[in-house]
Amino acid sequence: LIVQLLGAARIYAAEDPSYEKIALVYRAHGASLELLPLGADGIRSDALAATRASVLHITPYRSYPSNVTASAAKRREYIRWASEPGRYIVEDDFSSEFTVASKPEETVFSLAESGNVIYLNTFSQTVAPSLRMGYMVLSEKLAAQYAERIGFYSCTVPLFEQLVLAEL
């Protein structure tokens, strides 16, 4: 959906290492992908500055398989990077709800004001693994673009499961 929303002609970037299927999905949809090396607190600054990508796919909390969590400074660096026209961040936040801290990490989506962060999450870890439901949060601008370009898709999650989740 991300490639269909933003376009395959862009260069995408993802963390290295990252969940192997991220690269497979982008490439399967015809997107060029750069892998950016992780440091102790997120993508290395030199690699981020040098990338030709216009879309950055990040897992800022406990990135898999490295278990690296992006620092607050690194999250701000990602937002600064995305402040250039035509740049986007895809924030894949699959496990931030599970934290030993009293307060979960702030998402890049919640910190960015530009409307160019796409937030992805799932209910598989917080509610039940058998509920294979994810969700995407878009800014108003991106939601309008979604409706125009790929709004014809229908939901693949059975209605019964959606209703059960809504009651929780």
Predicted regions and their residues:
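Conserved Walker B
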Residues: 93-95
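Generic beta-sheet signal
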Residues: 15, 36, 90-91, 120
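Generic, low-specificity signal for short hydrophobic/alpha-helical stretches with a mild N-terminal bias
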Residues: 30, 60, 64, 90, ...
